[in-house]
Amino acid sequence: MRNHSLARTMRHALLGLALCLPMAKPVCAKQTAATTAHLRLTIVLVRHGIRAPTQPGSELDRYSAQPWPHWPVAAGQLTPHGRAGMQALGARYRLRLAPPLGLAASGCAGTEQIVTIADSAARNHASAQALLQGMAPGCAMRYQALPEGERNALFDGGKAPAPPVRLEAETRAQLAHLQAVLSACHHGRCATAPPTRLLYEPATRDGSPAAASTLKLAGGLAENLMLEDVEGFDAAQLGWGRVDRAAVAQLLALHNTSFAQSKRPLPVATAAASNLLAHLLATVQAAVGQTPSVAALAPPSTRLLVLVGHDTNLATLGGLLGVQWHRSDRPDDYPPGGALVLDLLERDGAPLLRVRTLMPSLSALRSGRLDDEALASSTLVLPGCHGEALCPLPVASAWLRTRIDPAQVQVALPAMQSWPVPP
């Protein structure tokens, strides 16, 4: 009897196991459906692609013993390599972001549910075009933007004074390293003809205007070295042959530190990003059937919204959201093609908000091969969401509204035009 009982128990156990085999997948899916969150909308704020330094060589040369390398495009413009990189990023976005939203991973069907908005700088226009060429090749895609050079308050918000700058010991060491590179120093001996202007004086006092201007300039010069690297300058040109890629990664900390002190603090971030955040929140609210108090950035039917902005937009919005995303394998917190992502999900009929990043590696930017491993994704937790990465939308919305300065918010969107994407 005991053996018969054991046999029946085993048959029941095997039957239960069979219910979870592939042929019985719908049964198991039904059991877990209540805990599955479904994507309804993804919003991507992405930095434009690889560009030339924004200052012409004649200005940069004042800070270096040797002329800066020549670029294939004018100051601040997207390079051909940068355009190709944004096309590759667009193709990766389509493969990675579209299917979870119920959109096809290729072809033109459903592309009307993809909306793209770009800032008015020429590099942003060009980046938006390249991104959409990669995302939907051969399709009649369009993006929204103001004409080149016109101020767009979504990307160029208000201004506020930054707090006094502190130069910590590590930052001072990085400044001294960068100054040695600029001054053509080797083993303590420097070029006989020094730069016209020095970047860094060790006597610079914390909190002084000189500290602020030094860190801002250093961040920009360090980023120029990164841009040389990812553009593919050879070893003899990269930092005049005085830095390798590891040194560039170390010096990039100056750019991160500069933004940490000048862009992310709330007085600055609140003024700069309140308008953008208000319209992002309105877009999410409209997608769940609510009536926002300011204009949404896209119709409620939109599944993927991409905004092509700048590193400053990532920094100020990140500061306003109260999130950090530095990773040791991604030395630049704001690389070309780097993005902050807002996901609207639904679970058991309740809307949820998730914040994450998609950051390309410098090697991927250099090669132009933006495969899935090249984009590092980190999920971030809003401080007002009590440790929940999937934050109930009412909770997230209530906290985000406390971060927005109404005086900085414009109810209507800028009068952007619709631009066709060249074939």
Model-derived features: positions:
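Bacterial N-terminal signal peptides that target proteins for export
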Residues: R2-L14
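Residue-level micro-sites within transmembrane alpha helices that shape
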Residues: M10-R11, A24, R47
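Bacterial N-terminal signal peptides
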Residues: A13-P22
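N-terminal twin-arginine translocation
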Residues: M23-P26, P100
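Boundary at the C-terminal end of the N-terminal hydrophobic targeting segment
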Residues: V27-Q31
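Signature for phosphate-centric chemistry
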Residues: T32-V115, D119-L305, D311-P423
